[in-house]
Structure formats: C-alpha cells, structure tokens
Amino acid sequence: MQLFIVKLDSRSSASNEILVLDINELRKYVSKHQLSFRGAQVHETNSEHSVRNWEDDNITMFFHTSNVFPSEKSVRHALFSRNSVHVCGPLNIGAFRDSLRVLQSPQFPIHTYGDDITVFDKLREFVVVPNSLAVVDMDTSAWERYTYSLFTDEPGTITLADETPPTISPTGRDSVSPVARFSPSISISSIAIGEVGSASKRRQRLVKQAKSSDKTPIPEIRLNKKDTVFAETGTEQASPKTEIVAATVHKIPVNHAEADKRVVVLKGRTKDKAQEVREVTSLARDTTGVEHELMQSVGDDSVQVSGELSGFGDESFEVSKTDVVGVENKQLALDRVPALEPCGEVSEDEELVSEGMYAVPLDLDIYAEKCPSPTPPNSPKKREKADHEPIDISSAMMKLRLIAAAFQKEMMAYDKIDCLSSDDPAYLLAQFCLRNLNGVFVPEYVEEHSSDEENADDPNQGWNGTPVHGSREIFEKLSESRLASMEMISNVKPIRWNSKKTTYAVTIERGNPNLIVTQSLTRGQSSQFRKVIRAFGCSTDYCLERLASRDYDAILMLMSSLSGACHATKSYCYLQIVAYGSFAAPECKELD
C-alpha cells in the first residue's frame, strides 16, 4: 500500500498535511468532483521524510498497515517533539505495543485504543498529555472512510471539512469525530509520494506466459524498491522445466513524473535433453500497469531489447550480461570472477548448465562431498582434520559462485568460506562479494550448535563465543584494501537467531536496510518458503553509530508480513528478537 502525504496550504499562516491511502483513489476522487490540484508539485520521498513532515501544531499521526511498524528513531522523534498517534491495522496491535516496550516508561506513556472510529473523540483528552503515544487499532476501511470524510464536494479545490466531520464507524453507526482543527477552504500545494515502512509494499508483480512448447507460465517476478528483480520459482503453476535465473530493471528517464517507464529484462532457462539455455524472455511495464512485450536477440555478451513503449515510439538499447544478472558497474563484474569448476571428477549426469558467465550446478551435493567442507566451530574432530592452509582469493571466489548459484536455484547454502582470518584479504573480498553479488548476504555458518545455547541470549557473543563485529569494522578493513566504499557496504547488517530448532538463512536486499528476506528450513520439513519481514530498528547511519560505539544492545525487532503460508492459515508468524551476528570467521586453531 502506498502512502501519500497531501500538503495543504491554508489561507492562514498555518500549513498542514493529511494522509491519503492510495493515489489512484485520490485521482478518482479528484476526477469525480472535478477538483484541481492548482499546480501542485508531485515529488517522491522516503517514509522517514514523510513521517517527519506530516505534522501540525497539535498532533502528529502515523498510519501503519497491519504488518508495518515505525522505526525507533521515528517514534522517539515524535515523542520528543509532539504528541503523536500511531494507527495500525487490526491484527498486530499487541505486537505493535510489544515492539514499543523499549520506549515505554513513566515519562513516555503509551495509550492503546480500540478499533472504533469514534476513538478520535478520545484524542481530545490524549493531546493534552505531553510526550505520550497513542496506538489506535483501526481497520483499514474504517480509516479510509474517516480520511475521505475530511474532503468536501466543493468544485475547484480539495478542502477539509469543518471541525466535526461526520464519519461512519465500523459498526455502521454515524458518529462525529473531531481531530485537529483544520481551516476550511485549504487547497493542495504539493503531494509527497512516500511508502509505508519498507519496500515490499512498493512491489509490482509481473506475470508472463513463456513461449516454450508446453506453455508453462514464468514464475512470479517482484520488483523491489531498488529496482532489482527477484524471481520466485516452485509455485504450483510454474513448471520445474522453466526457471528464471536472472533479471534486471532498466529505467527510461522521462520528464513527467507520472510517465516513468521501467523495462524488465528476464533471463530464462528451459531445460531440455541437451541441458541448454533455450530462451530469454523480456517485457516492459509502465506505471499504468500495462505490459508490453519486447523483441529480443541474445548475443555472446549482451541482450538486445527493442520494441514500442507508450509515448516513446520504437526504442532499442543493449544491456550487458553482467547487468542482466544484477551486477552493476560499481560492483564486481562477473567476468572478473574465475569460472566455477567442480572438485574432482563429474559424471555426465552432473554436468553444469552454462548460462553465459553464470554456471549453475545441477546437483550441489557433489560440491559438498568433494570440496573442502566448512569447519564447524563446535566440532573438535573436524577441527583436527581441517586443512589449515590459507585459502586464496580464487578459491574463495569459486565458493562464492557456488553460493550464488545455490540461491539462484532457491536452495539453502551455508557460507563455505571457513578458516579465514577476519584480516585475510580473501575473507574480506568474500564478505564484500556476498554483500553485492545478486544483492544477497549469506551469514557465515548459520546453523544451530549445542554449545550456542548458553550464549544464545548474549548479544555480545557470536557463534563460537567470538566477539561480535559490526559493519563499521569490516568497512574499515575493506577501505584499507580498497575493496569497497561506504555506499556499498553500509546497508548490510549480519543477523542471526535461533527459533525453536529452526534454521534460518538470511539474505538482505541490496541497498535496502529495512527489508530482509528469509528462507526457513525446518528439519524434517520438505517445503521451503520465503517470508518478507520488516526490521523494526534504526536507520543505517544510526545502526553504524551504535555498532561503532560497541553498543551491542542495538537490536532489530522483526515481525512477519503475514503473507504467504502464514496469511493462508490466518496465523501469526512470530520471530525472535535478534542481535547482530558475528562477522568473525570460525576459529580454526589446531587442538593439542
């Protein structure tokens, strides 16, 4: 759900903003009542900026869907500066209140209200309490009815209703719900287009039928905030014979804000007897949701995309294969990475499927058996047998290719970069690539060990009792090696947690510190699924600052998006409070 902040300029000196849930609904309302924006400026802004600027002299109000929660920084800002109300969806008010318990104190009381729209009557009493927080559990439809009740039907301008606009409660009873005293006859001066929470609500879904002989649909493609496409496979409708292995989004710059066009290039693979790449599918999408099929041709080094886009005529451009697999110019290009070669001999049945510069193994078990395995930090026997010779960069990069290939196949993979010192250039290069290659981060050896239980609740301890290292330390070492810049490394945070004998692998979308994608693997459970969860925490700079000061009590409160399997069963998906995990490599000292 998009969040639109409509800034209003009144005839008086005061200026206010109100919240509109959906821009399409706003356009419908404007068209229906022949209203005018009167030269309003439309600009995009992030959620933090929107929250900070949606304020008036009396009250600050934030809207959150049932699975989106404010950052601690935003809440503290509201508490210290103004009285505020947080409106959340009907399912998670308890979790919302729990997530704010770190802030609750006698100095900053938190008041909880029910889901009746008449709760705004009570806010008159609330606003006189300084530095307090109100949490309103309100159904989205009720909030919509309340929001639109602020508009009048006067042609020419969008104005706010008088002090006591009539509204409809969820029970159907008419009621009067005064909020702040807005002046009537206020025209729109600008519209700030923001997002609620993080990027998942911004995602658009593109589904296209493949041109293969069996007419199987291509799996769902999701666009995230940073214009990186993640392909999901394994759905009931998708045939296992057709798999999208890479995709990227290309923006076509335009002058008009509403005419933004995005071209999505998908790299598809259809297995046949020869195990060859058979097709590349491309499509484009504009902001109106219309999909345009494009013509394409595949060369040795690039993909040629051409076709007609709305308002632009025939367009043709090239994208390199490094772009197709999501590696940008500022990152390590795949052509600099040594080719992935299996350890030992490989039978004909285990041959790799070559996809340009990307090699995906059909059976990852052959690598696990024949390649040097990671040294578990709590396995003395394996420590004794471990090969303690330094691992060179080529070897580390080979393992990185293996890990990336595993994620492309929607499979679980552990970080196999073991026995490397945190000062080792190979380790630093490996960690850097893990943060940038395909936009995923593979935590090092994320697995439950018996000896971890005693340290499970200690945020100062890593997997083997090793001290926790933060992004700042890794960045400083990478800077010394000239392997990274702050822009590349700052948005990645390592996370670990244990939850009732369930092993999680955590990946973080490139460039978006607020969105975390998890794959859950429960022992004995055959199905794997992804959940999109949001981090209730702090901004990147704030987190780095706390890590730099070794304030390891900085935690992330994670809540499920109640989507996918969890939403289908109408159950809650609780996750544990997590601490920053260890960047330190497992210790590989020989035992006496």
Curated annotation (Swiss-Prot):
One of its GO terms (cellular component) is host cell plasmodesma. The keyword Iron-sulfur does not apply. Residues 450-469 are annotated as: Disordered. One of its GO terms (molecular function) is RNA binding. It comes from the Viruses. Keywords: Host cell junction, Host-virus interaction, Inhibition of host innate immune response by virus, Nucleotide-binding, RNA-binding, Suppressor of RNA silencing, Transport, Viral immunoevasion, Viral movement protein. Its main location: host cell. It is found in: Host cell junction, Host plasmodesma. GO terms for biological process: symbiont-mediated suppression of host innate immune response; transport of virus in host, cell to cell. Transports viral genome to neighboring plant cells directly through plasmosdesmata, without any budding. The movement protein allows efficient cell to cell propagation, by bypassing the host cell wall barrier. Displays sequence non-specific nucleic acid binding activity. Acts as a suppressor of RNA-mediated gene silencing, also known as post-transcriptional gene silencing (PTGS), a mechanism of plant viral defense that limits the accumulation of viral RNAs. This is Movement and RNA silencing protein VP6. It comes from Rice ragged stunt virus (isolate Thailand).
